[in-house]
Amino acid sequence: MRVEGQLGDEVVTIKATSIARRLHGKSHYGKMYEDRLQLSLIEAAYLMERGKLKLMKDDDEVSPEEFISLLGERGLYSKYLVYRDLRNRGYIVKTGFKYGAEFRLYERGGAPGRTHSAYLVRVISENDTIHALDFSSYVRVAHGVNKKLLMAFLDDEEDITYYLVDWIRP
């Protein structure tokens, strides 16, 4: 079953139907408001790829190719690839914005409101430079909020390698 969503500047909005409530309640997509479900662009791309979302911009349908192109233009494509990989592995993935990370990751069986996220996920392309002070701050923030840091390195072939980073006291 496909639900229709409206593409805005930063989010996709879906009317609060039973399907939208199920997407949020059972699968933990987006943020539910009284009258609507609000999805991030990355969540919307994933649901679109899985055939669960028909995306509209005003009265025109947005094709999956157009939407993936939009993600690329906004610098979100690499984040989407990591999000998709983690979701396909059965994890609940939510924004990590307030922690300075791309995502928060819940263990399988965990969920927002029932458990705390276990990991913060940082997405790094293989050609990116990571400065030691930045890397140190990623680890310290994760440790400070009782989470582990998962670094997702994306290569030019779109393969992802994960490294679990933990803080230790010298």
Curated annotation (Swiss-Prot):
SUPFAM superfamilies (UniProt xref): tRNA-intron endonuclease catalytic domain-like (SSF53032), tRNA-intron endonuclease N-terminal domain-like (SSF55267)
Lyase keyword on record: yes
Keyword Oxidoreductase: no
Gene Ontology CC terms: cytoplasm
General function of this protein: Endonuclease that removes tRNA introns. Cleaves pre-tRNA at the 5'- and 3'-splice sites to release the intron. The products are an intron and two tRNA half-molecules bearing 2',3' cyclic phosphate and 5'-OH termini. Recognizes a pseudosymmetric substrate in which 2 bulged loops of 3 bases are separated by a stem of 4 bp.
Subunit structure: Homotetramer; although the tetramer contains four active sites, only two participate in the cleavage. Therefore, it should be considered as a dimer of dimers.
NCBIfam families: endA
Protein name in the entry: tRNA-splicing endonuclease
